[in-house]
Amino acid sequence: MQDIQLDKRLSELLSQAVTPHNAQPIMQALCQSLNEHNIRYYVDDAPSITDSEYDRLMQRLKQLEAEYPQFVAADSPTQRVGGMALAKFEQITHLKPMLSLDNAFDEADFSAFHKRVSDRVGEVSFCCEPKLDGLAVSILYRNGVLERAATRGDGTVGEDITENVKTIKSIPLKLRGDNYPELVEVRGEAFMPKAAFEALNERARLKDEKLFVNPRNAAAGSLRQLDSKITASRALSFYAYALGVVEPTSHELAKTHYEQLQQLKSWGLPVSSEIKVCDELSQVFAYYQDILTRRADLPFEIDGVVMKVNDIAQQQTLGFVAKSPRWAIAYKFPAQEEMTLLEGVDFQVGRTGAVTPVARLKPVFVGGVTVSNATLHNADEIARLGVMVGDTVIIRRAGDVIPQIVAIVPERRPEDAKAIAFPQHCPVCGSLVERLEGEAVARCSGGLFCEAQRKEAIKHFASRKALDIDGMGDKIVEQLIDKELVQSPADLFKLTASMMTMLDRMGIKSATNLALAIEAAKTTTLPRFLYALGIREVGETTAANLATHFGSLEALRVATIEQLIQVEDIGEVVAQHVAHFFAQPHNLEVIDALIAAGVNWPAIAAPSADEQPLKGQTWVLTGTLNQLNRNDAKAQLQALGAKVAGSVSKNTDCLVAGEAAGSKLAKAQELGVKVIGEDELLALLAANS
């Protein structure tokens, strides 16, 4: 093995005869060397040994691991081949939400974003990077060792894909060096390079198997395999693009986004070589045009570029909106377009009641797929386009995912073209379709009655924060509706144990317990009942405010928009939603049926000032509470008049910090917000009980 270019220590170890006494240090040295060569190859782009030399080292390690399996290390490169297949993916709650980005589609959009940012924080530089078309991934390292990995999911909860991520050769199983934090979350994009995608489809073609449409679908499908051996065979890659949670928070990190990416690279994580800092708006546009021009020649698929405010302090000042950071934007590339014929328009009703026009198209191949349907969004979009049935239209796959009509070809309009009439009544249930002033989306107002909304309405009605029917999970609701045992929330209270034994995996004992839970749920509170009705934009707090203000369901049912606007935190839009909901006869019939079935609640007495000592205050909960669950603590604080928010700001009056409190505690301390522990909270609640 004298031809292998190794460090002196490894050379000395490999020259020894292997025994049970020295096998472990030899294997550790091999792991360390192979992992370092992986980083040099995938991260530094500067390999120091040949592929054949690497293969010989790997083969030697495999031989030793076969002889001494008790010494196999968790970070051994041999562990990337995949393990036992899973039955399903476990759910993981992200330590910090994985937010999505707002989009810019042209220079005007980005200029507006730039103005919003610079108006708030002054001059800014941007860290610009290609927007990889793959799957967002969170990877958690503890003491430098890869502990877990998860998909983005809905941003709050993702799927545990740890074993699959370990098969990606460019992701280190152990970080390089020793200057990393005790706990560090790395966020990035898992993707399939174009060459790997072509090879994968070629193998499928030879086996007469179904081909993947594009590299993104291939990457997503590969990463979500229950059998990690399949993932290991798919040649996925990864680029890190951000830090997530870092603990301890006192660990010194770079002050700019670009420098933080270089820190990630120094720890052995791959970072795109196309990243660049731009100080001027003109440089940003030049970067965009450069990447767009070279798009086809890049080794991976991209659908735009991402621009992030480079200064971390400015990022923190800008903060976040509900689902995205204010300091970053995805500047999307123009999607591919084709012309085809609009043959008709159908109207679909979604689970939330949104009535959406769907274009039926003469099938056309665009953006890598055959498209026969496209969204027309809403009535405003139909009017803006001036589109009619029979028109020749231009189809674009917006964001390379959702086909949409972007224009018509007027000169090709036939004489018999027909105008598109938006329905006045729901095509599913016949209820009035409402469209409030200032809103683009039209909605069916028969929320409790409409078949299209039925499953979601009843799931919500039975949920923990609504009627709280213990044991009535989503799967049971779906079965009840599919078997036509339930058609409205009131039908839940007609169910008997014997009826529910018809459900899958529902024995008489479980059915009896569920019947008892349904009976118990009849006694509730007016705020819970109002929340359970699923009125648009009426959450727990708004439901409580409505109940407190009007005192009874009877008074609320006949309230005018003017009266509703007088309720705390209710504006004209929410007032219109409430008024329209109670104006629908179908909804009133369901409410009357619920009351006739025995649903009841105690009368509400208006709280005195003494009973609401926290009125006007904003509180935030963070960390783990041992004696109260989060919802109970929230409800009790609200009963004392507090508004319970989800994030800390300068308007926060008090933060309750449980165990393992993280970024919210740090933010509160930074802003000088009062912080109390669980014991102090319990004392406060006891004193006001």
From Swiss-Prot:
Keywords: DNA damage, DNA repair, DNA replication, Ligase, Magnesium, Manganese, Metal-binding, NAD, Zinc. PROSITE patterns: BRCT (PS50172), DNA_LIGASE_N1 (PS01055), DNA_LIGASE_N2 (PS01056). Gene3D superfamilies: 5' to 3' exonuclease, C-terminal subdomain, 6.20.10.30, BRCT domain, DNA ligase/mRNA capping enzyme, Helix hairpin bin, Nucleic acid-binding proteins. Zn(2+) binds at C426, C429, C444, C450. One of its GO terms (molecular function) is DNA ligase (NAD+) activity. It comes from the Bacteria. Its cofactor is Mg(2+); Mn(2+). InterPro entries: BRCT_dom, BRCT_dom_sf, DisA/LigA_HHH, DNA_ligase, DNA_ligase_AS, DNA_ligase_CS, DNAligase_adenylation, DNAligase_N. Its EC number is 6.5.1.2. It catalyses: NAD(+) + (deoxyribonucleotide)n-3'-hydroxyl + 5'-phospho-(deoxyribonucleotide)m = (deoxyribonucleotide)n+m + AMP + beta-nicotinamide D-nucleotide. The active site is at K131. GO terms for biological process: DNA repair; DNA replication. NAD(+) binds at D51, S52, E53, Y54, D55, S100, L101, E129, R152, E189, K308, K332. The keyword Ligase applies. GO terms for cellular component: cytosol. Residues 609-689 form the BRCT domain. Belongs to the NAD-dependent DNA ligase family. LigA subfamily. PANTHER family: CHROMOSOME TRANSMISSION FIDELITY FACTOR 18, DNA LIGASE. DNA ligase that catalyzes the formation of phosphodiester linkages between 5'-phosphoryl and 3'-hydroxyl groups in double-stranded DNA using NAD as a coenzyme and as the energy source for the reaction. It is essential for DNA replication and repair of damaged DNA. HAMAP family: DNA_ligase_A. This is DNA ligase. It comes from Shewanella sp. (strain ANA-3). The gene is ligA.
